[in-house]
């Protein structure tokens, strides 16, 4: 992507981040740009000589905004981001993006791997396997856990002469107390008991355990699940040893998938702040109207000339139409801006942007507000009293995004709002 293509992409991220939080674009005032913004549309060689733009500082501001909107305090460490995300999370992301009718019950999905595993197996009890899985679960307070699933890969080591059919039973407990792994007297709560008849991935709902962990005191509660597998004998012959995969040299490790929703009132706050911003802008225009500033006769003639009907050639009409406010393409590639280490998917996407001017008379296709119409009329009469209405995003769409959080936990947000321009208008 060209240098200024990256700059345009980052500009969109800054606007999007501020719109989704309902905040003014304060960072723009902090950027060390010494010339008018129009300079960026000149020849690239001229820009380098005529402006003093700190691209590194600009990129850092943009990254800070995006991290904050994803509830990240910093970019995850390289050690954690280098770990391959579970295939389940990638498949889940691909399913949601490919099939728009596939809507999850919750907007946020996290995948937690085991922090530690202790296997308690007695050599005498060939058909009986027991594992204690320790997880480190961290869910923000403003999120509500709606569902939790334990995904386990069942393996079967068949013996010679054993029947082809498999049969066994798996029981999962929530370990309520007990700091020692070998504490057989620890209190347990039965979560699920399920018959096993095949190898491969199995899913078990453990919502009650995870909800308890989230609400409990982390200093007193251990996020532990006890998994017990028992193989059954069929016609006097053991089917083999049923077990779960827990060794770290495989991709089939146990996964705890936690579904949650953001229950904060961020949307309500955004609407209130946006309304306050609109009122502030209206007051600003009215204050300017109350002053006795007057523009030059030449400026007034130029603005009024736009409103007068005149005969245009077909080429001129096409040129004017192309300059009106509209949505245009803007392709964003996360690798080119150095964010691909923690954003897993998408690698790139079409963000779109708004380009063009808001000329009098404002037509319905740019959905002008009453304020924009009044502002345009005031500018037409006296450009010094009010600026033109701006071509800006009036509707933003969401995308699905898969990234790693501060702790390196793969996190999928199904509807990450405000990442793609849907409509443009004059405001």
From Swiss-Prot:
Origin: domain of life: Eukaryota
Tissue occurrence: Expressed selectively in the dorsal neural tube. Lower levels seen in kidney and myotomal cells.
SUPFAM superfamilies, per the entry: Cystine-knot cytokines
Signal peptide: 1-20
GO biological process: animal organ development; BMP signaling pathway
Ranges of biased composition (kind: Basic residues): 307-321
Endoplasmic reticulum in keyword set: no
Keywords: Cleavage on pair of basic residues, Cytokine, Disulfide bond, Glycoprotein, Growth factor, Secreted, Signal
Annotated GO CC locations: extracellular space
MF GO annotations: cytokine activity; growth factor activity
Propeptide residues according to the Swiss-Prot or TrEMBL record: 21-318
Major location category of this protein: secreted
Localization: Secreted
Disordered: region residues: 288-321
Disulfide feature: 325-391, 354-424, 358-426
Pfam families: TGF_beta, TGFb_propeptide
Positions bearing carbohydrate: 71, 136, 265, 292
Keyword Secreted: yes
Assembly and binders: Homodimer; disulfide-linked.
Family of this protein: Belongs to the TGF-beta family.
Protein function: Appears to regulate cell differentiation within the neural tube. May regulate the differentiation of cell types along the dorsoventral axis of the neural tube, acting in conjunction with distinct ventralizing signals from the notochord and floor plate. Controls the cell differentiation in the neural tube in several ways: (1) promotes the differentiation of cell types that derive from the dorsal neural tube. (2) ensures that the dorsal neural tube is refractory to ventralizing species from the notochord. (3) can diffuse and influence the fate of cells in more ventral regions of the neural tube.
Protein name in UniProt: Dorsalin-1
Species per Swiss-Prot/TrEMBL record: Gallus gallus (Chicken)
Lineage start: Eukaryota, Metazoa, Chordata, Craniata, Vertebrata
